[in-house]
Structure formats: C-alpha cells, structure tokens
Amino acid sequence: MSRRHSAEKREVLPDPKFGNVVITKFMNSIMYAGKKSVAESIVYGALDLIEAKTKQGPLTVFEQALENVMPTIEVRSRRVGGATYQVPVEVRSTRRQALGIRWLITAARGRNEKTMTERLSAELLDASNNRGSAVKKREDVHKMAEANRAFSHYRW
C-alpha cells in the first residue's frame, strides 16, 4: 500500500436499463471471471421476477432491500496494551453500500432456489421486507457493536 497517495475512486457508469449506478456496482459484484453479460442477465432477470411477483417498481424494491441491509455501525479491532478490544465505529457511506451489496449477494448464493436469478430475487424481496439472512447479518453486526459499547471511548 502506497504511503504517498491513496488510489482515486473510479467513476462507475450507470446501467443501460435503469440508468442507476448502484445497479452497476451490484452487477460488478455478482460478476465472476469478467463475465459481465452473465451478471447482467442474472440481475435484470431477478428484477423482472420481482416486478412480476410484487406488481411494483423493481428499483424501489431493490433500493429498499439495500437500505435494510446496510449497516450503520460495526466493530473494529483495536489493540491497547496487551489486550485487543472490539471498538464500535460508524461506517462510512461508501463502505455501507459495499457491505450491503456484498451481504445481499452472499446471502443469495447461500439460498436453495434452483437458479441464481430466483435466489437473488427471493433474497431481495426478503431483505425489502426486513427478513432473510442478509438482514440477519446486519442485525448481528449491530448487536456486536451494541455489546461492545463500553469500549467506544477507544475510537480513533
């Protein structure tokens, strides 16, 4: 890691169907081995399934799901003397989004539906209704931060 300059953030282009930057980031996270067209078909297929099931805008369901999964606080390890403390810290907005996307995808991959499109749509629907393993992951992180609130004065 360079000590002089931190890498500058790259501009992410909005996706062609919805014109949304977050959807593009989501696609890029789903993508394996540079196969963007496969990732695109999975995401768009999942959003089409959501639209068919709920009769409401798939973008609103997606945004609600992401909002319900994004953590506001997390714990980070801090060594003080000989002891390591789990110190609760607030999560930056870019990291919140990245963690939310990562947790949604991990939860979708762990589901039992047949295709990834079905798994992703089911997980997004669950997350938008505050259910599912991605939301559980966020609650676990928040519980951990709440349990270690006593060490919040070690914040840096």
From Swiss-Prot:
GO biological process, one term: translation
The protein's name in its UniProt record: Small ribosomal subunit protein uS7
Highest classification ranks of the organism: Bacteria, Pseudomonadati, Pseudomonadota, Alphaproteobacteria, Hyphomicrobiales
Cysteine pairs bridged by disulfides in the record: none
CDD domains noted in UniProt: uS7_Bacteria
Keywords: Ribonucleoprotein, Ribosomal protein, RNA-binding, rRNA-binding, tRNA-binding
Organism for this UniProt entry: Nitrobacter winogradskyi (strain ATCC 25391 / DSM 10237 / CIP 104748 / NCIMB 11846 / Nb-255)
GO molecular function: rRNA binding; structural constituent of ribosome; tRNA binding
NCBIfam families assigned to the protein according to its UniProt record, in alphabetical order: rpsG_bact
Subunit structure: Part of the 30S ribosomal subunit. Contacts proteins S9 and S11.
Source organism superkingdom: Bacteria
Listed GO CC annotations: small ribosomal subunit
Protein family membership: Belongs to the universal ribosomal protein uS7 family.
